[in-house]
């Protein structure tokens, strides 16, 4: 199951990014829902929200280490709960998708743009970002629901 999630996530990310590269040009949006949702091409040379701009070697190195650690944990420990396996698989697939961009282009292709007229603009992102975010949400749910959570008294 884990390998299927990882491979499908990478394929979905690559196909959508290749579409964005071929179909969109910088500054030319495809409006899907007026004043709310469009596709807008962006070459992100940093990480989330543009942090670590032009630090590709650092970002590539950190990403590779994180992927290897997550894969080691995912595939070595066969007794991991299903939600943890899915969570890590989603995060790994998204991390690999953006890693491919960083190595191939020296930037990450972003193209999904939510906004409200000209007043609110959510940062432009891609499918790999969605996979990492969904995986992280599932990981948080797993941590919160894990047995013994109440005994940790984190919030007391």
Curated annotation (Swiss-Prot):
Pathway: Protein modification; lipoprotein biosynthesis (signal peptide cleavage). GO terms for biological process: proteolysis. Keywords: Aspartyl protease, Cell membrane, Hydrolase, Membrane, Protease, Transmembrane, Transmembrane helix. It is found in: Cell membrane. The chain crosses the membrane at residues 57-77, 83-103, 124-144. It catalyses: Release of signal peptides from bacterial membrane prolipoproteins. Hydrolyzes -Xaa-Yaa-Zaa-|-(S,diacylglyceryl)Cys-, in which Xaa is hydrophobic (preferably Leu), and Yaa (Ala or Ser) and Zaa (Gly or Ala) have small, neutral side chains. Pfam families: Peptidase_A8 (PF01252). One of its GO terms (cellular component) is plasma membrane. GO terms for molecular function: aspartic-type endopeptidase activity. Its EC number is 3.4.23.36. The active site is at residues 110, 129. Belongs to the peptidase A8 family. This is Lipoprotein signal peptidase. It comes from Clostridium tetani (strain Massachusetts / E88). The lineage of its organism: Bacteria, Bacillati, Bacillota, Clostridia, Eubacteriales.
């Amino acid at each position: 199951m884990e390998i299927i999630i990882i491979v499908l996530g990478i394929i979905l990310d690559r196909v959508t990014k290749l579409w964005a590269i071929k179909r969109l040009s910088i500054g030319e949006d495809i409006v899907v829902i007026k004043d709310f949702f469009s596709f807008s091409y962006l070459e992100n040379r940093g990480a989330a929200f543009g942090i670590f701009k032009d630090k590709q070697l650092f970002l590539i190195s950190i990403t590779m280490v994180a992927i290897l650690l997550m894969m080691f944990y995912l595939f070595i420990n066969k007794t991991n709960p299903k939600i943890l396996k899915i969570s890590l698989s989603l995060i790994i697939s998204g991390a690999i998708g953006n890693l491919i961009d960083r190595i191939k282009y020296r930037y990450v292709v972003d193209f999904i743009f939510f906004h409200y007229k000209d007043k609110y603009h959510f940062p432009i992102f891609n499918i790999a970002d969605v996979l990492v975010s969904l995986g992280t949400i599932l990981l948080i749910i797993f941590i919160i629901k894990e047995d013994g959570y109440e005994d940790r008294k984190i919030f007391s």
